[in-house]
A protein has these predicted regions:
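Internal, hydrophobic cores of structured domains that mediate oligomerization or house catalytic pockets
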Residues: 114-115, 119-124
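Amphipathic protein-protein interaction modules
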Residues: 57-116
């Protein structure tokens, strides 16, 4: 059974994953978009994760990447960031519902670690 779905372009999928990871790694972009202060874009913690996991199926992409490239350094980083996000997401969803919750997420040491670790993927990919 192929990991790729019918008519799915792996290059487009990969490019979209990297774009989503760049957004995940950019704390300044998050500050602007999550607060509604960006002149063109608006987003949220939930939307940031929804793009990566719901729209782009990040966990399936990790398996696809492994099937093509093996268990190399990038694969290990993908897995590590996936585990970190899975450990944090429930806290993030709850915090986001609070008044100024997005600010609390952006100041959370675990979220800051996730954004920094994601930069490692961007630099090595």
């Amino acid at each position: 059974m192929s990991i790729l779905e019918e008519n799915e372009d792996p290059l487009i999928w990969s490019n979209n994953i990297i774009k989503a990871l760049k957004d995940l790694s950019d704390i300044e972009f998050q500050k602007l978009t999550w607060s509604g202060e960006h002149p063109k874009f608006i987003s949220s913690f939930t939307e940031t994760l929804a793009i990566l996991y719901d729209d782009l199926d990040f966990e399936r992409y990790i398996e696809y990447y492994k099937s093509i490239n093996g268990m190399n350094r990038i694969y290990e980083l993908f897995n590590e960031i996936n585990l970190m996000i899975n450990d944090f997401k429930d806290i993030g969803y709850e915090t986001e519902m609070e008044i100024d919750g997005y600010k609390k997420i952006l100041e959370n040491k675990d979220w800051l670690l996730i954004t920094e670790k994601t930069k490692d993927i961007i630099h090595e990919y």
